[in-house]
Amino acid sequence: MYIAMNRFKIISGKEETFEKIWRSRDTHLENVPGFKKFNLIKGSEKENYRLYASHSLWETENDFINWTKSEAFREAHKGAGQHSDIYLGHPEFEGFEIILWSIFKIIWSFRPLYSVGGM
């Protein structure tokens, strides 16, 4: 498995604009071979920016590389430079091969707030 991350430094006060851009964009990832999962994560606030990262999970690094050469990638990044006023510098890419993988099982237990039928 492979994790691809882009780290973004978003100028303080521009966070809502950045999040709106991501919420409204089509990533074109749903049918890409090897794609598993995507998250946009928000980090800590610094003196003049907030850190964000796009975090995508891939079956292999090669699947990710193939996506970066695809039409789907070009479509997903179309117009990416239009909002340069919200960024403090260029995004920083980081790629990671997963060497240990652990899945934690979450068990939900609940009881009804009310019962029907006198129970």
Place the predicted regions along the sequence by residue.
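Glycine-rich beta-strand-turn "strand-cap" elements at beta-sheet edges
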Residues: 2, 39-51, 78-113
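N-terminal first-folded block
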Residues: 6-8, 15-32
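Short, conserved charged micro-motifs
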Residues: 14-18, 63-66
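An amphipathic, aromatic/His-enriched active-site/gating alpha helix that lines ligand/cofactor pockets
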Residues: 28-36, 57-94
